[in-house]
């Protein structure tokens, strides 16, 4: 935002080689110490300023057409609150207790129950849980492309481990499962994958970006 308000962007160049020893993709940002009215190299969405080459900004603007965001749809996005190895004394095999859902429990977009070789890691926890439907996302990579592995949690009492991302409404919605299904359908949209490759590359998507930047097609 400061750059946009105080400087003129001369050019943004994507570098094809990796930066020294980090193997990170890099760009060259060329700015001039004066302000001119030009928005060829950036756009604004949800109070964020997105930078890119002129070609990429044009593509991003096209991908945002007829889209919304989870934030605009009145959803919050956060990570699960349970760090399992910090509450080992509360974990149990007792199936009458609250189900603790780990990232590895989401397989092929369905909830499974994994048996762990680590005996301290158990599938249930002696805490009060939640019962309302919840959409969880396990961020991952597959065949060089960023992929979502997601699942709607419902009809059980649960808590979520901190390696999963949770999407939930800020206020109660009667048709919440139907709305979750529409969000999932948006994740499956080819335009979503195109946006992710263009904007995020192979970088991790944080909760703020998922909530306020990723376009949702519903």
In which residue ranges do the predicted regions lie?
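Polybasic, glycine- and aromatic-enriched phosphate-binding surface used to engage nucleic acids
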Residues: 63-218
């Amino acid at each position: 935002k400061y750059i946009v308000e105080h400087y003129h962007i001369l050019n943004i160049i994507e570098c094809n080689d990796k930066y020294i020893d980090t193997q990170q993709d890099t760009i060259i940002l060329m700015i001039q110490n004066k302000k001119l009215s030009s928005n060829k190299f950036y756009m604004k969405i949800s109070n964020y300023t997105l930078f890119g080459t002129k070609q990429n900004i044009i593509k991003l603007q096209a991908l945002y057409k007829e889209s919304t965001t989870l934030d605009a749809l009145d959803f919050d996005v956060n990570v699960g609150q349970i760090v399992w190895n910090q509450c080992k004394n509360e974990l149990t095999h007792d199936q009458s207790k609250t189900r603790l859902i780990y990232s590895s429990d989401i397989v092929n977009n369905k909830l499974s129950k994994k048996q762990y070789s680590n005996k301290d890691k158990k599938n249930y926890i002696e805490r009060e849980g939640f019962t309302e439907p919840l959409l969880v996302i396990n961020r991952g990579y597959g065949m060089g492309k960023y992929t979502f592995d997601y699942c709607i949690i419902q009809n059980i009492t649960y808590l979520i481990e901190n390696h999963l991302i949770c999407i939930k409404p800020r206020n109660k919605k009667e048709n919440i499962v139907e709305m979750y299904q529409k969000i999932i359908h948006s994740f499956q949209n080819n335009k979503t994958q195109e946006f992710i490759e263009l904007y995020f590359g192979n970088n991790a998507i944080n909760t703020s970006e998922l909530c306020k930047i990723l376009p949702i097609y519903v």
